[in-house]
Amino acid sequence: MDIKYSAAANHLGSSAVREILKVTQGNDIISLAGGLPGEDLFPLEAVRDAYNRVLSSDTSALQYGLTEGFTPLRDKIAERLTRQGIPVSASEMILTTGSQQAIDLLCKILLDPGDAVLVEAPTYLAALQVLGSYRADIHTINNDEQGILPDHLENQIQKLRPKLLYAVPTFNNPSGATWSKERREKVVEICRRYNVLILEDNPYGEITFEENKDLYPPSLASIDRSYGGDYCVAYTGSFSKIVAPALRTGWIIGDSNLIKTIAKAKQAADLHSSTIDQRALDELLLHFDIEQHIRVISREYYSRMKLLSAELRSQNWEGAHFLEPRGGMFLWLTLSQEINTKELLPLAVENGVAFVPGEVFYSSQPLKNKMRLNFTHTPPELIPVAVQRLEKALVQWRENQSTVRS
């Protein structure tokens, strides 16, 4: 049958990360590609006990639920966010099937084809996919190590009149970078002044490598709410990185009218997210010390990041450099200017290691000598092996280039 796809379907792109994961699945390949937490750190027993308690209590967990999500769980998330400096109530929140759905639903209610959206460079690949599916006109804001540049942001707002600024200001995916407090305050002030909604995506913010949380800047949502009155920041979070991704439970908070409109879009999409998963998470938060669990995984991820950093430095590749992230899951490696990491990837896979080429994280003018390396999923004993395999691939790539030139 010759199916006539919609214009929106024809704008759907495939995730480069998902395609890489397909290639590496089941093979003897060490994958530094996916944004995967460490399976050895999943709280398996606590999750199993939570589901057992839910299923042994009554049958209501198997029934349809509220579109906004299980109220006791929303209350607990609101309490955690309030302790983190984001005062919020359950009425300003909706639970979603991971924070990825939150991004999609917000774009669905906000964007018409051709609407301008501002992003960082680089930025989260799957957010670019969502924006592309709604045929947004995506523009990049210049940035430095402190975050996006306020002057360029204001200039682009005046020029483009965007509907949305999408940002991952804390442990950015893919770069691992974190905006400074001063830069955050300026960005929020500008967006409030020009009435531009910010979508602050924060799936990694609780994975911190310094135990003193006061050393980290406040979220954009926290700064925004300090003004009082109308909010210009919608904020997403998730249990995927701090508990387990298969639970598929995230949230978005924002102005109560915004949340009501998102709820209408969610009703049309899937009625509600999984009741049983939300009930199990509620039980988990009641009976499991999630704060201690986050401290444990953060310490282990810090150790793995330092190991990967040391192994990369030991190679002493000409022109290679990176900054160690202060949290999160990714290290952003820059190689010498002539190396194309997309061309390097097949050689890396042949040698038994995978990464994500940096160019997929740009909406335009991609930098081809970058790669994203995940350090959370790979067991520590395999990290040195992964770097050795990457070194072999680089040697082969250079040999191939020499052959082509000759």
Regions found by a protein language model. Give the residues of each.
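N-terminal small-domain helix-loop-helix segment of the aminotransferase-like
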Residues: 8-98, 105, 286-287, 292, ...
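Conserved C-terminal alpha-helix-loop-beta "cap" of PLP-dependent enzymes
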Residues: 258-259, 263, 333-372, 380, ...
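Conserved glycine-rich beta-strand-loop-beta hairpin in the small C-terminal domain of fold type I
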Residues: 282, 298-309, 321-334, 344
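PLP-dependent enzyme catalytic core of the Aspartate aminotransferase-like
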Residues: 1, 350, 364-406
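Conserved core segment of the aminotransferase class I/II
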Residues: 229-299
